[in-house]
Amino acid sequence: MNTARLNQGTPLLLNAVSKHYAENIVLNQLDLHIPAGQFVAVVGRSGGGKSTLLRLLAGLETPTAGDVLAGTTPLAEIQDDTRMMFQDARLLPWKSVIDNVGLGLKGQWRDAARQALAAVGLENRAGEWPAALSGGQKQRVALARALIHRPGLLLLDEPLGALDALTRLEMQDLIVSLWQEHGFTVLLVTHDVSEAVAMADRVLLIEEGKIGLDLTVDIPRPRRLGSVRLAELEAEVLQRVMQRGHSEQPIRRHG
């Protein structure tokens, strides 16, 4: 795997995207632009449409209406450039760690798989079985499995939700460092607002199928845990999430 930084990630443009399940409107004419290489976190209450948005971008669902574009190209036409991680690492227990990383690949892929494992600190576990790994190590393997494809877009659906606090912080740092190195676009869905503001360039709140808050995280990297500014931004997002009344227009907070 070439570990040189990619020229850019996948730029995303959603135009009036809606998703309905019978009478249930999950996404409601949602408009969104994400520049190439941006790290975006999505927060919100359960059922607000966060995971549905990720599934649309992953090609696991199709929109009821609207366009999902990578620049000017339908995202579905370049779906091979998109990879997704879930809360469950989804490793095949009957395959070794390195075989899980190279799943579905053909040709001479083992050197690339070893490089991907080295990037996540698990090169020495290549020949082991998934059962021998901790939860955090399994998620590192899942991340390596995404990296080997050199994605333009990495979708993260609560990938750290089941990890202990220390392992979660280590994984946050790893994901951010790999994003900085490779330049892919990241969309992270999380229920943890502190995680969102610690990792992302931008935090979106989705409520009632629309964007209710669009917040730029104006803190340089590396970010210091416990900083006053991080706490202020976290409080701002939490306050908005907890509001019962909803304005017609999204609230934007930049810089």
Curated annotation (Swiss-Prot):
ABC transporter domain: residues covered: 12-233
The protein's UniProt keywords, in alphabetical order, are:
ATP-binding, Cell inner membrane, Cell membrane, Membrane, Nucleotide-binding, Translocase, Transport
Q: Name one GO molecular function term.
A: ATP hydrolysis activity
Residues engaged in binding ATP: 44-51
Output the CDD domains linked to this UniProt entry.
ABC_NrtD_SsuB_transporters (cd03293)
Q: Identify the main location.
A: membrane
Which top-rank group of organisms is this from?
Bacteria
Q: Which SMART domains match?
A: AAA
Identify which top EC class this enzyme belongs to: translocase
InterPro entries on file: AAA+_ATPase, ABC_transporter-like_ATP-bd, ABC_transporter-like_CS, ABC_transporter_ATP-bind, P-loop_NTPase
GO cellular component terms, A-Z: plasma membrane
Gene3D superfamilies annotated for this entry?
P-loop containing nucleotide triphosphate hydrolases (3.40.50.300)
Q: How does it sit in the membrane?
A: Peripheral membrane protein
State where the protein is found.
Answer: Cell inner membrane
Q: What is its EC number?
A: 7.6.2.14
Q: Name one Pfam family in it.
A: ABC_tran
UniProt-listed PANTHER family: ALIPHATIC SULFONATES IMPORT ATP-BINDING PROTEIN SSUB, TAURINE IMPORT ATP-BINDING PROTEIN-RELATED
Quaternary structure annotation from Swiss-Prot or TrEMBL: The complex is composed of two ATP-binding proteins (SsuB), two transmembrane proteins (SsuC) and a solute-binding protein (SsuA).
Identify its protein family: Belongs to the ABC transporter superfamily. Aliphatic sulfonates importer (TC 3.A.1.17.2) family.
| The protein, known as | Aliphatic sulfonates import ATP-binding protein SsuB
Organism from which the protein derives: Escherichia coli O1:K1 / APEC
User: What is the name of the gene encoding this protein?
Assistant: ssuB
